[in-house]
Amino acid sequence: MASRAVVRARRCPQCPQVRAAAAAPAWAALPLSRSLPPCSNSSSFSMPLFLLLLLVLLLLLEDAGAQQGDGCGHTVLGPESGTLTSINYPQTYPNSTVCEWEIRVKMGERVRIKFGDFDIEDSDSCHFNYLRIYNGIGVSRTEIGKYCGLGLQMNHSIESKGNEITLLFMSGIHVSGRGFLASYSVIDKQDLITCLDTASNFLEPEFSKYCPAGCLLPFAEISGTIPHGYRDSSPLCMAGVHAGVVSNTLGGQISVVISKGIPYYESSLANNVTSVVGHLSTSLFTFKTSGCYGTLGMESGVIADPQITASSVLEWTDHTGQENSWKPKKARLKKPGPPWAAFATDEYQWLQIDLNKEKKITGIITTGSTMVEHNYYVSAYRILYSDDGQKWTVYREPGVEQDKIFQGNKDYHQDVRNNFLPPIIARFIRVNPTQWQQKIAMKMELLGCQFIPKGRPPKLTQPPPPRNSNDLKNTTAPPKIAKGRAPKFTQPLQPRSSNEFPAQTEQTTASPDIRNTTVTPNVTKDVALAAVLVPVLVMVLTTLILILVCAWHWRNRKKKTEGTYDLPYWDRAGWWKGMKQFLPAKAVDHEETPVRYSSSEVNHLSPREVTTVLQADSAEYAQPLVGGIVGTLHQRSTFKPEEGKEAGYADLDPYNSPGQEVYHAYAEPLPITGPEYATPIIMDMSGHPTTSVGQPSTSTFKATGNQPPPLVGTYNTLLSRTDSCSSAQAQYDTPKAGKPGLPAPDELVYQVPQSTQEVSGAGRDGECDVFKEIL
């Protein structure tokens, strides 16, 4: 037994005057509307006849039901679920209205009611503005509860004790209040949601819910389409109607998958629901289906041209003399060029597709002429199907005794999708236009998959008899309709003068076969996989970093062990020569190791030791070291090698370099057989005793024995200039020694340099001082 809604408006205490109820949607279940019989004061009306009429009326109400009143809003009552609202919802409901809904489901079931919104003014403590819910219908009903309140949170559901329940809404004088929206279902639908629930209300990445009938709300909107998904702010059930997974008149189960949002959501028209353009959101949702949603071959060419036929073809000759024919083979979706167009403009025209065998058809996509200069399209149509091409059946929704009218296009270029729920199992499909713009013209594509019968082999059908070209162009006879399913086209229908869409187009259908290609089918598996991979990757990266750090430390430690030092980069040709003076020489003999002693060290020596040192057979004079001249010195070291401390030394460190003394240090003589001391420098001043400052002079070093090569380059220049200065400065005496090899005198005395008067000006003195410091 289908659900029913009875709406009564009472204003007169003696005679109920029935006001015109708010028009119920044409797709609502049990659309018959009956009013209560008026009161009569006639005394001639016999009592038995009145009781008989009352009994007949009660039987009619029991079978069909009625909806009356002025306080009812959006109402869809299905056999297992439905949705109802107060009048003007979500705007403020008017004063002094009343509406009563009586809901009945099949025997053995109970009713569950859930509220999506409740906002009834409670200023009068629920005396004049309230919603009452009763168990049962009629005089035997018992009250479950009386509810009012602004913004009342009714999260719990209300259940009936039997298969019947009554809702009574009453409004008096009030200021505010949206009213209410409620949905119901049979008790076994534990996961019932309302038409206002969105994806953002649920935290699970995947979930399944039951959508009630009637969720195609006139005030709600969605954003998105398939297969890209819907914005998370879209109502779930309305998006399910648009996607084709549930029917607006029946409701159904949906399986939702949540994923990351996208920057832009497209607008599209499908199943009488228009989705609007949406912008970036944090998440989106889509629906899991079985996947029977592929194209059947109109666009791809799998369906051959002879398999596409029509009632008539539009042909004409233009002003240039060219013949134009918009044949049925041009009715392929997304193919450039003109569409199929009918020659006649009446409701007997059709476009037929032969699939060669039975297939499961889940939907259809249509478009107009796709030509801006020809604004032709079909705005409403019916679907007929057949197994043999002779006996045709009009598509209807389950439990509805009216033909399903599908909404078509609103312009000449946009694609519009409609789904079949339940799907059609047939070989032949006909599209019968009922409304159009100017001319009947369209392109189309069928959606579905192969049909595999369960428990029986595929049914083979014979192809329809061939048709000649004259029949194709001029056929206006209506198709044969199966008895009991749809009326026959026996009388010509009057063409419609307007393109107004009929009320039946608000009924929607759905397809269970939509696949989402942008969302992973199982999020929990991905989470488990990530929980395993992340620790493994962290361990691998940590191990790699440790290996690199250990290798770096080992390399540095190896360098320290080998004692490698970095040297400054000098010229490759002379860097080694310049380093010879800093590197210790490998002494072959004791005599080859030159030693330089400072004057302070000589002073520490006793006279006996000095005499012994000066009694060398041969003495060589060490060449002076000039700071900054690198690569021209032949002696590798000027330090005496450590041979142990002697008693005559006062310095603790024998390698201590000479300090800055107030007097000049003298070079020590270097004997050949023993420690060699630098020999005195003999300056040959005979050639330039009175040379002026501007004239260069020549000085030489004189030594006995093996004489090293003279210094050249800058060093000679410096010596020459020094000689020129020596004529005006103090002279140093040479030691009083005889020929090499002769015994030295008892005591060796060096004269202290004597200061003299300045010979030249301040400029000459400054110049000589500079060179003196260099030497």
Curated annotation (Swiss-Prot):
Pfam families: CUB (PF00431), F5_F8_type_C (PF00754), LCCL (PF03815). Residues 72-186 form the CUB domain. Residues 292-449 form the F5/8 type C domain. It is found in: Membrane. It is a single-pass type I membrane protein. GO terms for cellular component: cell surface; plasma membrane. Disulfide bonds join 72-99, 126-148, 215-237, 292-449. Residues 550-775 are cytoplasmic. Glycans are attached at residues 95, 155, 272, 474, 516, 522. The modification Phosphoserine is found at residue 606. This is Discoidin, CUB and LCCL domain-containing protein 2. It comes from Homo sapiens (Human). The gene is DCBLD2.
